[in-house]
From Swiss-Prot:
Organism: Novosphingobium aromaticivorans (strain ATCC 700278 / DSM 12444 / CCUG 56034 / CIP 105152 / NBRC 16084 / F199)
InterPro entries per record: 6-blade_b-propeller_TolB-like, PD40, Tol-Pal_TolB, TolB_N
Biological role: Part of the Tol-Pal system, which plays a role in outer membrane invagination during cell division and is important for maintaining outer membrane integrity.
SUPFAM superfamilies named in the record: TolB, N-terminal domain, Tricorn protease N-terminal domain
A cellular component annotation (GO) from this entry: periplasmic space
Record keywords: Cell cycle, Cell division, Periplasm, Signal
Quaternary structure annotation from Swiss-Prot or TrEMBL: The Tol-Pal system is composed of five core proteins: the inner membrane proteins TolA, TolQ and TolR, the periplasmic protein TolB and the outer membrane protein Pal. They form a network linking the inner and outer membranes and the peptidoglycan layer.
Name of this protein: Tol-Pal system protein TolB 1
């Protein structure tokens, strides 16, 4: 939902199978470790990622093809994951020699040292007799001639990309000292059709933009999705039956239920970090306020009661505070309050308007849309200081954080055409890229790491 749509609406109303871990087990801690504090510290770290080996090249029921082709595809996904996060510049798998199956755990370090590789990622893929796939992943320090990490997973053929994401997560966590984020999913709104008759469907995809799946038919407009903390459901706004209300979509059962019966239109839903509460805004008698209701059902509690429009809400990671937007001062601005609705405090005093705030999983920053002519993605501390812009386009809005709080996804609307697409940017603001989607896309919502 665009900012204009959200506030206009309020004014008018006054809106999977798990991967099983298998051998090899992770190695003991040792070798390279550290914490990324500066982008340049790791930017030139040479990570070689050749195609994964296989014990036998046999057909698989995957989109990649045989186990040999799948080994190439696994390395490509891992390399792309690490390249696109802004910390590393991996090389391969193209132009690199593929190791033999027997070399995966006994690399020729001299070969890789001659290629100026500092780190080496090798692995294998094996087709099992039960139809499953086993993927092994190994991280080596070339100079030390030492294995740093190893892990393996047994996955269904349809989930082969999850094994690649998990391998990238293992590498990222070891080399950066930070929590990983690749093995996660994004809920978003898939858009199609002309501007005056736009179809908006609830959809999900992998964090890198692969494996798209539509969840709703598009007969009713869907907006502002949010994954539950346990990944079992998605909270979203729908115009099902012609009235804007909040629903929970059950991903296993492919069913949806109404969150609560209310006298006025409801919109801008959000989960609490523990999944026990749902925040929402409701417009009644010319006023819009924020409420919370037990996720299991029950009576709603009103959290704001001021003249004007109070919209949205994002919990701090510990669930003790809520950041939200309000026009009580005359324009959209960002406020923070306690989770019980007490102690409201404005934190945006930097000119223009501020909207769609989202608390970082780390708790140290709040991402939001800053509106001064154009719409830009920015971050600020919970106290309102340290303002930084991450994008500089015509209309960027609705930021959502990666599980580790290092990457932000948002959607960008093209001037003139009105076409929307999902983009991501790291906290330096220098590593920006568009995610590929089958059609137009908006309202991204990044979920936590998959279990």
């Amino acid at each position: 939902m665009t900012l204009r749509m959200l506030f206009a609406f309020a004014l008018l109303a006054a809106a999977p199978a798990q991967a099983q871990q298998t051998e090899p087990q992770p190695a003991e801690e040792g070798g390279l470790s550290g914490t990324v504090s500066d982008d340049s510290e790791w930017q030139d770290l040479g990570i070689a990622i050749p195609a994964f080996a296989t014990n036998a090249d046999v057909p698989t029921p995957t989109s990649a093809g045989s186990t040999s082709a799948l080994g190439q595809a696994l390395a490509q996904v891992i390399s792309a994951n690490l390249r696109n996060n802004g910390l590393f510049k991996p090389v391969g798998p193209e132009s690199l020699p593929r190791p033999g199956f027997e070399q995966v755990q006994a690399p020729d370090f001299a070969v890789w040292s001659a290629r100026s590789a500092e780190m080496l990622v090798q692995g294998y893929v094996r087709a099992n007799g039960d139809g499953q796939l086993t993927v092994g992943c190994y991280l080596y320090d070339v100079a030390l001639k030492q294995q740093l990490e190893k892990a393996g997973w047994t996955v269904a053929p349809a989930d082969w990309r999850r094994a690649a994401h998990k391998c990238a997560d293992m590498i990222y966590a070891r080399l950066s000292g930070e929590s990983p984020f690749f093995d996660s999913r994004v809920a978003y709104i898939a858009e199609s059709g002309p501007k005056d008759r736009r179809m908006k469907r609830l959809a999900i995809m992998d964090s890198d933009g692969a494996n798209h799946r539509y969840l709703t038919s598009g007969q009713a407009t869907a907006l502002t999705p949010r994954f539950s903390p346990d990944y079992k459901s998605i909270l979203y706004l729908s115009y099902l039956n012609g009235r804007p209300r909040i629903y929970v979509y059950d991903l296993a059962a492919n069913t949806q239920r109404l969150v609560t019966e209310t006298p006025g239109p409801t919109f801008a839903p959000r989960w609490s970090p523990d999944g026990k509460w749902i925040l929402y805004s409701m417009a009644t008698a010319g006023n819009t306020d924020i409420y919370k209701v037990p996720a299991s059902g029950g009576a709603s509690q009103r959290l704001t009661d001021t003249p004007g429009i109070d919209v949205g809400g994002s919990f701090s990671p510990d669930g003790s505070r809520i950041v939200f937007e309000s026009d009580r001062s005359g324009s959209q601005q960002i406020y923070v309050m306690n989770a019980d609705g007490s102690d409201h405090r404005r934190i945006s005093f930097f000119g223009g308007r501020a909207a769609t705030p989202e608390w970082s999983p780390r708790g140290d920053q709040i991402a939001f849309t800053h509106i001064v002519g154009n719409l830009r993605i920015a971050v600020v501390s919970p106290g309102g200081g340290d303002l930084r812009y991450l994008t500089d386009s015509w209309q960027d809005e609705a930021p959502t954080w990666s599980p580790n709080g290092r990457i932000i996804q948002f959607f960008r609307t093209e001037k003139g055409s009105g076409k929307a697409s999902v983009w991501q940017v790291d906290l330096t603001g220098r590593n920006e890229r568009r995610l590929s989607t089958p059609g137009d896309a908006s309202d991204p919502a990044w979920g936590p790491l998959l279990p």
